[in-house]
Amino acid sequence: RLDFETSGISLFCKSNEARQRIGDLLGANQEKREFLCLVHGSPQEETFEVDAKIGWVTGEPEIMVAGKRGKFASTKFEVVERLAGFTLLRCLPSTDRKHQIRAHLQHTGLPPVGDAYYGGSLLMLSRLKKNYRPRRDGTEKPLLDRAALHYAKLKFEHPFTGDAVEIECGLAKDMEVALKYLRKYATGIGAGPVD
């Protein structure tokens, strides 16, 4: 159920039986999932939780909204790093709803960078760097041209052996580059890694 823009872990099964068992396991929310998301703004708290129903936006089949209608969803968020005007968050969903993290972040006023569906704008170097000089043709490419959401870790019980399985995926290169430029040019009070 990953969005096509989300980088990171993709899980494939070798048989229909494995697919069915993994599907049952994931559907029962018995796995532990961890995402990293770069957002506009900064939460007041170091950790916070959003418990808000998620439902479809009328007339928009690809957009979900957090509010009073829809299915219950819960996501815990932890600050990983603060940068002036931006924050890298660890996202720990305990339910599995379409666009859950993105809708919950929009609901809290912290839209994901690059996520036009959920209120985020593209990350442009010209907005960060003083004395920025564009290319000769005057164009500028965004530092990140997708929603800044990365599937970093998945823990679950193997469907046949019962062994604990943990899969980790390092941050995608485009997000690493975006963070490099943010660390260099978007510094300020309260910026930096959180211990």
Regions found by a protein language model. Name each.
Residues R1-D195:
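RNA pseudouridine synthases
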